[in-house]
């Protein structure tokens, strides 16, 4: 589950036809000096402990009117369904990145570590990779009038998020043996759902949150300014600014039953921001499912689940490219991608080329299956118009229907390997 200078006048002219590769960004609101973060009696609090699951069917909400960050599964998850809150950012250079995901998920209960975990990746320009998959004792999600907040904590470490109800601001904090600090996010994009419709409290189509059968999605922040400031246990400070966003995922079953793989992208180029999901579904009617959002100066241009050419509906086309310099280690050897967003009603198209430039993380599952994350160079814009250059993050996966438990122990079980986990994961990614 995926941002160069703020000067607007930087223009590089190339050979005829004249095209301006410009670098600029949407202007997000400044992060406030303080956020109201007090939990009181006006808040509804959902608590979940590490080994708590609901026996039998529970309440699984697919409502398009519920706030995107609200708890979707009540009173708690059961043995199959799960939910996740995800936040990510990439530096303006594209060399440093951060991804943080909070999950309530019993998919890997056989580890004996519980159902609460935090996935945490930081990649730095010098090649340093910090990978955390931390199993936590308890989690709280507070749904308050002005914000939604979550805390995943154990006696010696804590991770938290705080998102305002208007989806403009988010603050993330982490305090563990490996890294301490946080990051802020400021966005002026409106929240949207999987079908491209804007989220409103009045609701939308009944299936508006569904990407593929069993998998549901809300886009809280399509594009946001990100400011990261953290310190490693070694004393080294990590600080960068960039672009990123936030998404919500919840599903009826584990990933291996839901799909054989996915490709996820968050990118920006000049005033454009792109968020795209491509899922090869296994449930219901197996096949390819897409959800794409294209913003211009933080206003939605195209939002659609249509992945083929249409004369009437907005659509998005996606193609893998193989002519670049960098690919993943596993079966999928693409070196980049091309996106084409189209709006027949506006008689306009937008095209963007994305090329992998940095491998951020990889995890293998054997026999060529696995997951790869990349930082990317992005170039594009309106067809026949000004072209812009930017950066992006992508993640691609390809999974078998079944993974032997010993391999899952290696791939996902590193959360309790202790301080040597990063070195173990590097070794595992090459072995598998």
Swiss-Prot record:
Signal peptide stretch: 1-20
Annotated metabolic or biological route of this protein: Mycotoxin biosynthesis
KW Glycoprotein (keyword) present: yes
Highest taxon above the source species: Eukaryota
Glycosylation sites: 59, 78, 153, 308
Keyword annotations from UniProtKB, A to Z: Glycoprotein, Isomerase, Signal, Virulence
EC assignment: 5.5.1.-
Gene Ontology MF terms: isomerase activity
Record's keyword annotation contains Transcription: no
Family: Belongs to the Diels-Alderase family.
Function noted in UniProt: Hexane cyclase; part of the gene cluster that mediates the biosynthesis of pyrrocidines, fungal natural products containing a macrocyclic para-cyclophane connected to a decahydrofluorene ring system that show potent antibiotic activities toward Gram-negative bacteria. Within the pathway, pydB functions synergistically with pydE, pydX and pydZ to form the cyclophane.
Stated name of the protein: Hexane cyclase pydB
This protein's encoding gene: pydB
């Amino acid at each position: 589950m995926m941002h160069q200078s703020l000067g607007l006048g930087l223009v590089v002219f190339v050979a005829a036809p004249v095209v301006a590769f410009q670098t600029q960004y949407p202007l997000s609101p400044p992060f406030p000096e303080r956020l109201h973060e007090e939990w009181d009696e006006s808040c509804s609090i959902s608590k979940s402990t590490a080994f708590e699951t609901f026996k039998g069917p529970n309440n699984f909400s697919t409502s398009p009117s519920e706030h995107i960050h609200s708890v979707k599964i009540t009173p708690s998850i059961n043995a199959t369904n799960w939910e996740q809150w995800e936040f990510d950012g990439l530096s303006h250079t594209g060399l440093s990145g951060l991804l943080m995901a909070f999950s309530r998920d019993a998919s890997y209960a056989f580890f004996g570590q519980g159902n609460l975990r935090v996935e945490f990746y930081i990649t730095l320009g010098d090649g340093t990779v910090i990978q955390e998959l931390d199993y936590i004792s308890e989690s709280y999600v507070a749904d308050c009038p002005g914000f939604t907040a979550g805390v995943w904590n154990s006696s010696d470490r804590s991770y938290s998020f705080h998102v305002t109800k208007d989806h403009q601001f988010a603050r993330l904090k982490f305090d563990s043996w490996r890294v301490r600090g946080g990051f802020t996010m400021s966005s002026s994009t409106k929240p949207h759902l999987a079908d491209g419709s804007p989220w409103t409290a009045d609701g939308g189509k009944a299936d508006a949150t569904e990407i593929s059968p069993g998998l549901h999605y809300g886009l809280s922040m399509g594009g946001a300014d990100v400011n990261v400031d953290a310190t490693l246990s070694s004393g080294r400070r990590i600080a960068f600014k960039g672009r990123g966003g936030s998404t919500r995922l919840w599903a009826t079953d584990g990933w291996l039953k839901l799909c054989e793989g996915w490709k996820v992208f968050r990118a920006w180029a000049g005033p454009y921001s792109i968020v795209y999901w491509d899922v090869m579904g296994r449930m219901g009617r197996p096949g390819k499912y897409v959800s794409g959002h294209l913003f211009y100066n933080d206003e939605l241009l195209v939002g659609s689940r249509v992945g083929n050419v249409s004369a009437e509906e907005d659509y998005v086309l996606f193609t893998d490219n193989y002519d670049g310099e960098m690919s993943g280690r596993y079966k999928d050897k693409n070196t980049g991608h091309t996106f084409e967003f189209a709006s027949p009603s506006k008689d306009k198209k937008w095209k963007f080329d994305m090329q992998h430039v940095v491998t951020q993380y990889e995890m293998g599952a054997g026999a060529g299956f696995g997951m790869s994350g990349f930082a990317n160079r992005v170039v594009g814009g309106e067809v026949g118009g000004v072209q812009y250059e930017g950066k992006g993050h992508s993640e691609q996966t390809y999974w078998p229907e079944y993974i032997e438990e010993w391999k899952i122990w290696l791939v996902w079980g590193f959360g309790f390997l202790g301080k040597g986990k990063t070195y173990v994961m590097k070794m595992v990614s090459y072995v598998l």
